[in-house]
Design a protein with these regions (language model features):
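Sec-dependent bacterial lipoprotein signal peptides
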Residues: 1-3
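Beta-strand/loop edge motif enriched in small/polar residues
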Residues: 5-187
């Protein structure tokens, strides 16, 4: 594995999901304004970068995911605002659990033109939930799953700002827009 930094142009030879598969996208950092961009957003609990980590984002800043990435079946903790950028695809394998960090109000935001492919099964659904223990979870524990497409919205307004979001807008005139698949997913 190589470092995910702008001064290290090498690429990771794995696909980032821990199974040693072929590289789907390079492992490099970039910036878009004040937001970090990276093909892999996985970290260790101590916020060190790790393409095989179990923490998505580091909670210190927003991230925008670019390229094509697959989250292998497992349990992940999402910290901060994680964006699936325009032209990017995030696939989540069946049986995966993604917990949202309460302190950072973690959210997964699929921007217009980005895709989330989350196809669970009856026996192995994909679950998005609060990191809080069972029985202590409450509305507002985390930011949720936000999918912003280019189709008409119920406000009749093009490019409507998402609630609480500093950058992402939704709505347009493309009613054939496709932001991915949610099947056997519990939020």
């Amino acid at each position: 594995m190589v470092a995910c930094s702008s001064d290290d142009p090498e690429t990771d030879t794995g696909n980032g999901n821990g199974n040693g598969g072929n590289a789907e996208a390079p492992y490099v950092w970039g910036t878009e304004g004040a937001i970090k961009t990276c093909d892999h957003l996985l970290f260790n609990d101590d916020k060190t970068e790790n393409a095989k980590g179990t923490v998505i984002g580091n909670g210190d800043q927003e991230f925008i995911f670019k390229g094509t990435q697959t989250l292998s079946k497992g349990t992940y903790l999402m910290k901060g605002w994680i964006y699936v950028g325009t032209g990017s695809v995030l696939t989540i394998e069946p049986g995966t659990v993604i917990k949202g960090d309460k302190d950072t109000q973690a959210a997964l935001i699929v921007e217009p033109g980005g895709k989330l492919i989350a196809e669970g099964t009856k026996d192995a659904p994909i679950v998005f939930t609060s990191e809080q223990p069972k029985g202590q979870r409450k509305p507002g524990d985390w930011g949720g799953l936000i999918i912003c497409g280019n189709a008409k919205n119920n406000q009749g307004v093009l490019n409507q700002q998402i609630e609480g979001g500093p950058r992402t807008k939704h709505g347009g005139n493309d009613d054939a827009d496709n932001s991915g698949v949610l099947r056997y997913v519990r939020v």
